[in-house]
Amino acid sequence: MSDSRPSGRQPDQLRPVVIQRGFTRHAEGSVLVCFGETRVLCTASVENRVPGFLRGKGEGWVTAEYGMLPRATHTRSDREAARGKQGGRTLEIQRLIGRSLRACVDRNALGERTITLDCDVLQADGGTRTAAITGAYVALVDAVNVLMKRGDIKRNPILGAVAAVSVGVYRGTPVLDLDYAEDSDCDTDMNVVMNDGGGFIELQGTAEGHAFRRDELDALLGLAEKGVRELLDAQQAALSA
């Protein structure tokens, strides 16, 4: 046990990860992903149309929407629909999810159709965007498998797996997969998106307290690589079940 983390986890230890496929019945892909107490419902919906800028080009599109239930956190938040617009954080996160998933898709093989990943946070305890990316990939694969089974596409457009994890410096120690208690009190917070080839798709890093050093950055990236490998294994296990 580590006494430096509120949860007692070791610095390089993920929270328990659960990836449950087929969580709802109507969407082509549906996954409940849990990173500890963070729970996100990820659904993949297929539509036989593309945005205007892609019409007639023979390419598909992958996009994402992200939202939180009003009581996903300690206190209730108004629904963004009631406010009449999405917040900046919501837009930032859903664009991140969309970019991350497009990085693993051959859009020519998808044809002129759109797959939308809807990521709804049921309960938030840190790492909602990384959980959303990790779960949305599995939902995306299930949706693609439906298209293949129906004969709508001839070639699998999935280029490889994608997963994401948070890392940070908490009380002077680089740690993996921050929960809310750590995320709200860390010196550095970073989200790392990677593919199964070890390539980095996106890095989002911020010094919350003091500037981080190069050696701390290297340590954080090393932790992220370890965590993503474990998440990729969890994705594969879920898809093989």
From Swiss-Prot:
It is an enzyme of class 2 (transferase). Gene3D superfamilies: GHMP Kinase, N-terminal domain (3.30.230.70). One of its GO terms (biological process) is rRNA processing. It comes from Stenotrophomonas maltophilia (strain R551-3). Belongs to the RNase PH family. GO terms for molecular function: 3'-5'-RNA exonuclease activity; tRNA binding; tRNA nucleotidyltransferase activity. Keywords: Nucleotidyltransferase, RNA-binding, rRNA processing, Transferase, tRNA processing, tRNA-binding. It catalyses: tRNA(n+1) + phosphate = tRNA(n) + a ribonucleoside 5'-diphosphate. Phosphorolytic 3'-5' exoribonuclease that plays an important role in tRNA 3'-end maturation. Removes nucleotide residues following the 3'-CCA terminus of tRNAs; can also add nucleotides to the ends of RNA molecules by using nucleoside diphosphates as substrates, but this may not be physiologically important. Probably plays a role in initiation of 16S rRNA degradation (leading to ribosome degradation) during starvation. Homohexameric ring arranged as a trimer of dimers. Coiled coil: none annotated. PROSITE patterns: RIBONUCLEASE_PH (PS01277). This is Ribonuclease PH. Phosphate binds at residues 89, 127-129. Its EC number is 2.7.7.56. Pfam families: RNase_PH, RNase_PH_C.
